[in-house]
Amino acid sequence: CAAKLSQMDRLGIDISVLSVVPLWLFHWTPAELAQDFCRQANDWLANFISGSDRLAGMATVPLQAPDAAAKELTRAVTDLGLRGVQIGTTVNGIPLDDERFKPFFDVAEESGSTVSIHPCYSGKPPPFQDYYMKNLTGNPLATAITASRLILSGFLDRHPRLKVILVHAGGFMPYQIGRLDHGFQVRQEASAHIQKKPSEYLRRFYFDTITHAPAPLTFLVDLVGQDRVILGTDIPFDMADTDFAHIIEQAQLPPSAITAIESGNAMELFNLG
């Protein structure tokens, strides 16, 4: 805990919302093993953040067993004081809009728990093994695919109050939303389950700032609004954005946007006030 707080001090971070690493999502293991692991991981995280009021946490759940995941989320939020949950983009290859996950998302929505979606691979890896593309290209692609499904399947209409974060600034999704809108207009498959253009669903999501460059961050804030973007770092990974302050400054955002992105939005989203 002391080392984490010291790191935050060096970076100028007042409060951090922590989650387990994606490798620990354990969506691909037998359900019983995942249930036991998630319970221990959440207990550990709750104990870790209890050492400081500058730390908060997000749970992990055995989503391959949706009823058990719903129960663990309830325990993590109610008993442990965690502020939400992190899940993968798929669960052992099954997309999140599949009806089998409804019990979990119902509880997340009813409890007001924020759901952060992070790329997670299981089974056969994506065909991006060269040049570190599994991360550089595969991660934002996985997020874009999942976000597309959540929009086009009608999932967001079925869960109108669910709070969802798309990490890595939404992957490729925000930058190709016009393509989905065009498909909605010309293809029956893309309009069968929704009544509005896909772009009208973008503000249902929250997006972190991890663009690694100011220009795409400027575009993102202009596209979705300053109230839908929160500061993200990806610490402690090699792809972490520890230069976030400079990037936000170079994005030439108005002072109100900077305040919202650096503090206000996350304070409200995670009930940190």
What kind of feature is each model-predicted range?
Residues 1-15, 43-50, 71-75, 162, ...:
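Mid-to-C-terminal alpha-helical segments outside catalytic/metal-binding sites
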Residues 1-91, 99-100:
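Mid-domain alpha/beta scaffold segments of enzyme catalytic cores
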Residues 18, 57-59, 117, 166, ...:
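Structural beta-sheet core signal
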Residues 25-27, 69, 123-130, 241:
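Short acidic/His/Gly/Ser-rich catalytic and metal-binding motifs that mark active-site loops
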Residues 34, 38, 42, 144-148, ...:
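Amphipathic, non-transmembrane alpha-helical scaffold segments
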Residues 63, 119-123, 235-237:
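Short glycine-enriched loops at secondary-structure junctions
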